[in-house]
Amino acid sequence: MSFEVGTRCWYPSKEQGWIGAEVTKNDLKDGTYFMELTLEDNEVVNVETKDLTNEKDPSLPLLRNPPILESTEDLTTLSYLNEPAVLHAIKQRYSQLNIYTYSGIVLIATNPFDRMDQLYSQDMIQAYSGKRRGEIEPHLFAIAEEAYRLMKNDKQNQTIVVSGESGAGKTVSAKYIMRYFASCDEENSSNMGNLQHTAEMSETEERILATNPIMEAFGNAKTTRNDNSSRFGKYLEILFDKETAIIGAKMRTYLLERSRLVYQPKTERNYHIFYQILAGLPEDVKQELHLTKADDYFYMNQGGEPEIAGIDDVSEYGITIKALTLVGVAPETQQHIFKILAALLHIGNIEIKKTRNDSSLSSDEPNLKIACELLGVDPSNFAKWITKKQIVTRSEKIVSNLNYSQALVARDSVAKFIYSALFDWLVTNINTVLCNPAVLDQIHSFIGVLDIYGFEHFEKNSFEQFCINYANEKLQQEFNQHVFKLEQEEYIKEEIEWSFIEFNDNQPCIDLIENKLGILSLLDEESRLPAGSDESWTQKLYQTLDKPPTNKVFSKPRFGQTKFVVSHYALDVAYDVEGFIEKNRDTVSDGHLEVLKATTNDTLSTILESVEESARKVEEAKKNAASQDQKQLKKPTPIRQVQRKPTLGSMFKLSLIELMQTINSTNVHYIRCIKPNGEKEAWKFDNLMVLSQLRACGVLETIRISCAGFPSRWTFNEFILRYYILIPPVEWAPIFQKNDLTEQDVINLCKKILAATVQDKEKYQIGNTKIFFKAGMLAYFEKLRSTKMNSAIVLIQKHIRSKYYRKQYMLMKASLSLLGAYSKGTVIRQRVEYELEQHAATLIQTMYRGYSKRSYISGVISSIVKLQSRIREELEQREMQSKYESNAAISIQSRIRAFVPRKAYESKRRDTIVVQSLIRRRIAQRDFKKLKADAKSVHHLKEVSYKLENKVIQLTQNLAAKVKENRQLSKRLEELQATMVTVSELQDQLEAQKMENQKALADQKDGFVLDSKSLKDQLIKANKDVESVKFELATLTAKYTEMEAESKNQLDELERTKTLLTESKTQNSDLYSEIKSLKEELAHLQTSIALGTVTTNTNIVPHTPSRENRMPSGHMRAAEENISPNQLKSIPSDTAADHVSVNGYGMDDDIINTNTLTQINEELYRLLEGTDVLNNEITEGLLKGFQVPDAGVAIQLSRRDVVYPARILIIVLSEMWRFGLTKQSESFLAQVLTTIQKVVTTLKGIDLIPSGAFWLANVRELYSFVVFAQHSILTEESFKKGMNDEEYNEYVSLVTELKEDFESLSYNIYNIWLKKLQKDLQKKAINAVVVSESLPGFNASESNGFLNKIFNSGEEYTMDDILTFFNNIFWCMKSFHIENEVFRTVIITLLNYVDTICFNDLIMKRNFLSWKRGLQLNYNVTRLEEWCKTHGLPDGAQYLQHLIQTAKLLQLRKYTIEDIDMVRGICSSLSPAQLQKLISQYHVADYESPIPQDILKYVADIVKKESTSAHNDIFLHPETGPFNDPFVAVKTRKFDQVEAYIPSWLVLPVTKRIVDLVAQQVTVPDA
């Protein structure tokens, strides 16, 4: 032990138990150490000692752990394992709202006295499901999960022992453990896909959970320490089958506090059930039971507080009634139970009259009569045995009177007997329901939950406290043996050297209680004596036990003869003997028992029979035990057959022995519940109270056992990653750089570290997988590491500062040299500059004078030259003007001469055209009359129509040719214009050259004439070229004008022809209307004849009204473009079948060839009527055998490539409706809808995204068609023709129901698909967003390559996988033409899901809450944000706010209150509870200071003040459905025609034939 100045330690305190201190002085004088301690309250304490290393010296303070370890999750990891360290760790965690702490194999649960629903939510259950203990923070769910997994994997029964004093939270803990098992079973059933099993198990689980409110109502009461205190012990076995599914349960109860029924101390209550029936029973029932209010009953008004704050007895009554019904208690039986309970209250009000020596009770006493009436017993006999007793001897029965006190005891005894019997009967009834013979045959394993009272000691301790402490002695002994066994097993498993660990054995105390001459045996012996009393029993105890060897654990008090003292494992307890004998007897008189057996209340009769059966089983158990003892002793002593009523003590002993046998046969887990204060105040921590409970519940004993061995255990990797710096780098650097690292390399490095740091090899042991350390070694290593790091930091700082200041010096030196050089250079440059300026001035003067003279001479010469050039220019211009005027005159003459004959020609041409027009008009009129005469013939009309159309086509072609020729002429014109521009540019060049030549003439007079002549020749030639071009341009312009006029004439003729055709059609419309009715009648008759043939063969005569009234209006076009019938003939049949009308129409029905149409209808009807083949082909071949087209960046899919299944279905459905096959269509659609949903349900793997999007697009297409059909039917009057109102309404109803069906299908497959996407995303998101470290250079320490090289396993995902996932969704939905609104909804839902599940996972991972992890998280989320921005979701970040703000929180400072306030402002999306959780779990790096405890307390206080129970949940709740269908908000697709496209790889012969037949309806008119 080291006590240098500055050492932190603990010093005893009367007020707080222990108080923190610091060594401020440590002097050694004359072999004595004089230490001065400064306590946290500034008090100074002096300590003197001879030896600082003597750990057993009580004067020495206890060493305190480093701050980073003070709030550890497992107390056994503390470096200094002592009482104050344990207490302080629990207190620190409690102040941070962490109520659970591990202490080795024990879970310590500190009652918060506050609602903590968020700790037990379904999200929390899922967080712990499948996790190993210690993987996430302590929780009772971790204990439950460990028990469940051990039972499942090791096939071994488990027990969870929940203990603690009243008010510590045992009942709540046991209840949530049961809920966890039920949830695990439900999850297990769901994973196995056994839906029926899940449904069945849910009922069993509900029944098991229903036992809680029943047991609480009949066995719990309000005490001074607890508002819901269990007044009995309970061991519940949850039974599992071979598949580890819950199939039932069994319950055992121990030592119900019967005296509470008749007596309650101040501020306490009776059992809850009495207050519940008074508050919840209907008024008429209460009148029948003669019930009023609690204050009117003696058994309920003694405590004085009939109500509990915050508890509604009416609602609790409803819960109890529901639970009773659930476990099989019939309503009639419930009424009988209430009668019994009411009778007990009335029994308590029976007034017994007191006489001098006796007591009396009239059979007419009102309360007695009511009680007997409710119990169904005789009031006279019942009253008799309240005031009398009967003693049975061998020869006679002696009846004597009871005094007043004895009569009260008799009255209360019968009440306690009835209530106890009722309680036991309820337990038996529950066991019968939850563990019937069918369940017994299936039991494979069980998990037992023991909810039992903790060690109790009060000012007055009676029989109940004695039994409770006896049970705790047995449990503590088993606990100590279990802890020792686990320690021993681990040492053996790791193959380390170990020595026997001594621990306090409480076997002497147990022997004192249960030996043949022990306390219980003497108590039973005294209880069987008629004159037995507490005083005589006490004397027997003193005489028998107050001597060796029992006097070590038994003693009598210094004063008085009414108590005895037992030295329990926790402390010595003095028991008051008053009432021991009476409570142990716990019997009712034989007279009362006979009266009760004669009851007319069937339920009470059943209860009494159950009591007798239980007593018989106890006697048989005792006989079996006695006979086995005789066999062991090998003495053939006869067993006396004496029938005795079992005492309460003997019954409790036997049940406790049975319980211990059960526990010893199972693997045990321990939960110790701690009550932090006596006032039940939320989040208040009383040091002394908690300390006493830690001592009593064996936690400190566990720690002492651990300290005696090797309490600290580190894996090799953890040890190296933490302490490798304690040896030189040359030792560990090669290991980290080694690629083929082995586990032996790791072990060797550990040995090197230990050899270099620890001299005493007894302080550690190296096992197979761990290193075991003695207590205090962890602090030793931390001190070495801190010293090493501090020296390294100093060294680094020294070198950094040295380099910095050297650099500064060198910079200053270089600066001085540079300054000198600059100064000298400046002086020299100034001198040189002056000389240069002098030289420049002289040179400027010289140059200026020369320039001035040259400028004057040049000006004179220039003036002369300009004068000469101007004169020459004027002469030349006059000559050019003369030539221009001459040429203009010639041009005017030629044009005038050409105008006169052209005008004459045009006049003649116009006259000729007029004549031709008149002749053509006369011919046209003649033809028109002929057409009118032949109009009566439909075939002639068709020919005329075709000729006119051909004429239109011919004229169109001519017009196109003319337009093409015009375009060529325009192109030629543009070329000529370009030539003119070129010529103009050439002329400009010549002009420029001419000017240059003129200037040259002034210097070269002699060559002027020749050059001028040459230029003139060139100019004349250029002018000729210009004239030629102009002439050609004029010719082309005239030709273009002529052709334009001709084109206009042809266009006019085309318009006239179209007008003529329109007039012809208008005139023929009258003829159409005349034959329309005949035509309709003919078509109807022929169709009927054809269908009559079919029905004759099938003996079915369906009603088929005309098809134009059956389907939505709007004729179908042969293709998307306008194609004439003649053109349609040349189209191949496959192409013609590609485009089909929505309703099956082809061209106008008036021109369909009747015979061909009849044949088509016959075959279509036959194919559609027999739906079995068609349904099977559509289901198996189309819907199940579909192929999804590839989607991606470079792939452009047409709509027909995507929705081909929908369009095929639409065609089939349309034809069914056209023929009136409504029943067949309903069957067909039902199978289609079911199959599509099944197909989507089975999607998985790489097919999930494309196939899901594919079916979303197809179902949307089908739904749009149905909406279109419904709208057409309801808005167009033509649909009512050919149908009566009944048929029309039936058709409307069919389409309306179909619309609803498709709405449901769209909703279902969207939900199924989205849930599957979430499930797929769940596997990837956490690894990719939370775990993966994509940002280089900021890898967290827990992801060190050392750990990954050896122990890395499992599938890993990165952000690239997540982005690929979202990219696949984007491209599939885009390629499949799914609306953007739907894509946006899907992505937003998935982003919210990623945000939720990643946050929920992150908040439970302690090691991931560091600033480096914050950087990595921020980087990963940023990549997701960028993807959203580039894919049309700029607001994607708002759906990832929790992750974004968590990343910010991890990177921000958190060391002051101002920092916390700033964090709260930035992280506005996080609740106070979430902020507190993240900050308290923040993983401090080696170079960071721990967050101060006062800051953590400040954050916790914010949660207490600002949060409500609804906002305390640290988890986000993912939106997992049901989801709203986003297609509801999107407009349906438009329908004009359906393109029937059947891919070549589909084998659908019947479907293809139907499509071909429908397509032939388009080509029939041209046949």
Curated annotation (Swiss-Prot):
Residues 619-640 are annotated as: Disordered. Gene3D superfamilies: 1.10.10.820, 1.20.5.190, 1.20.58.530, 6.20.240.20, Kinesin motor domain, Myosin VI head, motor domain, U50 subdomain. GO terms for biological process: actin filament organization; establishment of mitotic spindle orientation; Golgi inheritance; intracellular distribution of mitochondria; membrane addition at site of cytokinesis; mitochondrion inheritance; peroxisome inheritance; protein transport. Residues 1230-1505 form the Dilute domain. One of its GO terms (molecular function) is microfilament motor activity. InterPro entries: Dilute_dom, Fungal_Myo2/2A_CBD, IQ_motif_EF-hand-BS, Kinesin_motor_dom_sf, Myosin_head_motor_dom-like, Myosin_N, MYSc_Myo5, P-loop_NTPase. ATP binds at residues 164-171. Pfam families: DIL, Myosin_head. The keyword ATP-binding applies. Keywords: Actin-binding, ATP-binding, Cell cycle, Coiled coil, Motor protein, Myosin, Nucleotide-binding, Protein transport, Repeat, Transport. Residues 947-1091 form a coiled coil. Residues 70-786 form the Myosin motor domain. Residues 446-526 are annotated as: Actin-binding. It comes from the Eukaryota. Residues 4-57 form the Myosin N-terminal SH3-like domain. Residues 789-818, 812-836, 837-859, 860-884, 885-907, 908-937 form the IQ domain. PANTHER family: DILUTE CLASS UNCONVENTIONAL MYOSIN, ISOFORM C, MYOSIN. Belongs to the TRAFAC class myosin-kinesin ATPase superfamily. Myosin family. Myosin heavy chain that is required for the cell cycle-regulated transport of various organelles and proteins for their segregation. Functions by binding with its tail domain to receptor proteins on organelles and exerting force with its N-terminal motor domain against actin filaments, thereby transporting its cargo along polarized actin cables. Homodimer. Interacts with calmodulin (CMD1) and the myosin light chain MLC1 through its IQ repeats. This is Myosin-2A. It comes from Naumovozyma castellii (Yeast). The lineage of its organism: Eukaryota, Fungi, Dikarya, Ascomycota, Saccharomycotina. The gene is MYO2A.
